[in-house]
Design a protein with these regions (language model features):
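N-terminal juxtadomain amphipathic helix
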Residues: 1-24, 28
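Short, Lys/Arg-enriched anionic-surface-contact patches
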Residues: 27-46
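Short, basic interhelical loop/turn and adjoining N-cap
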Residues: 59-80
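Long C-terminal interaction/binding lobes of large macromolecular proteins
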Residues: 77, 90-168
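Generic hydrophobic/packing signal
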Residues: 26, 54-58, 81
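Short, solvent-exposed alpha-helical "recognition" segments
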Residues: 82-91
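Short, charged/polar micro-motifs that form catalytic or ligand-binding hotspots
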Residues: 8, 12-15, 36-41, 54, ...
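Short, amphipathic alpha-helical "recognition" segments used to contact nucleic acids or chromatin
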Residues: 43-58
Length: 168
């Protein structure tokens, strides 16, 4: 076991992370709770709020910095944005292929629909994530509590399960 100290901008939490030794490969395996990202200090909700505000509301760095009141620092938010942007197309292509297989009637896949009207890969990924979440909610009752604002958190968890690696 080891301790992680994730932050939400106002306080630092202390979370126990359990780890096991894989008998097959002799590497350690950790089980992170779904509100933590690998290699990030801030909670997934905090990262998600920044990325969505930047992508969909067009929030400037000065606006985000003023709202954050110093935590997270603007340079940290910029790193999240760059990381998200560098992975967005890769994740988007996987989500679109998955939707085409599982929900071919999805409005996101309509050649005259919402998917063709977005202006960038970050916005496209967030849009596709909403449709993926809607599809998943129709299949699994456990997702009933997820809403539109949770779509980035959901897609990160889904992508981790798909082996997509790091998004932010």
């Amino acid at each position: 076991m080891y301790w992680r100290k994730p932050r939400d901008g106002e306080r630092v939490y202390r979370v126990a992370i359990y780890r096991w030794l894989c008998q097959a490969c002799q590497r350690t395996v950790s089980a992170l709770p779904d509100f933590l990202l690998r290699f990030r200090w801030y909670l997934l909700d905090v990262v998600s709020e920044v990325v969505v505000a930047r992508a969909e509301q067009g929030a400037s760095w000065s606006e985000l910095e003023a709202e954050a009141k110093g935590a997270p620092h603007v340079r940290t938010m910029q790193r999240w944005w760059v990381s998200f942007g560098s992975q967005a197309l890769r994740w988007l292509s996987v989500i679109q292929a998955f939707l085409a297989q599982q929900d071919s009637g999805s409005p996101w896949l309509d050649p005259r629909g919402e998917g063709v009207r977005v202006t960038g890969s970050a916005q496209a990924l967030l849009g596709a994530a909403g449709y993926l979440l809607a599809w998943a909610k129709s299949r699994w009752r456990e997702l009933a509590g997820y809403s539109w604002k949770d779509r980035l958190c959901f897609v990160w968890l889904w992508g981790s399960g798909q082996g997509l690696g790091r998004l932010v």
